[in-house]
């Protein structure tokens, strides 16, 4: 998959979306959204976010409702992402794998800033000076 699309045609976007849907376990492309399970709807929304050309990608718990193979695919996809990634997740190791900087924020205060390995060694909720 071409992660940064540029001037893709509608056909290429549809092909990319179908490839992503298949990787995320959705293979019936004609099934109405209303008939999808909650997890399938979340995965479909993830595909919509990933296929759209963007400079910033915002994801909320992207590995929820994904099995191990799907998470691995998403991890590889995000490693190739050429834009900024803002993600809310409890999976720090996934986060460390797909980002080069992590900022931990709680109640409007920055508590950690760095890479996951450093943040895990930092006492929880110790404010950082940046």
Predicted regions and their residues:
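ABC ATP-binding cassette signature C-motif
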Residues: 1-129
């Amino acid at each position: 998959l071409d992660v940064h699309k540029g001037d893709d045609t509608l056909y290429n976007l549809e092909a990319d979306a179908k490839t992503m849907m298949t990787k995320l376990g959705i293979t019936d492309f004609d099934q109405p959204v209303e008939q999808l399970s909650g997890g399938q709807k979340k995965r479909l929304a993830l595909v919509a976010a990933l296929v759209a050309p963007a400079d910033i990608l915002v994801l909320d718990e992207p590995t929820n409702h994904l099995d191990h193979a799907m998470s691995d695919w998403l991890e590889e996809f995000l490693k190739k992402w050429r834009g900024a990634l803002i993600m809310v997740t409890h999976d720090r190791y996934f986060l460390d794998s797909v980002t080069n900087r992590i900022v931990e924020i709680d109640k409007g205060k920055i508590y950690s800033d760095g890479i996951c390995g450093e943040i895990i060694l930092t006492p929880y909720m110790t404010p950082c000076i940046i």
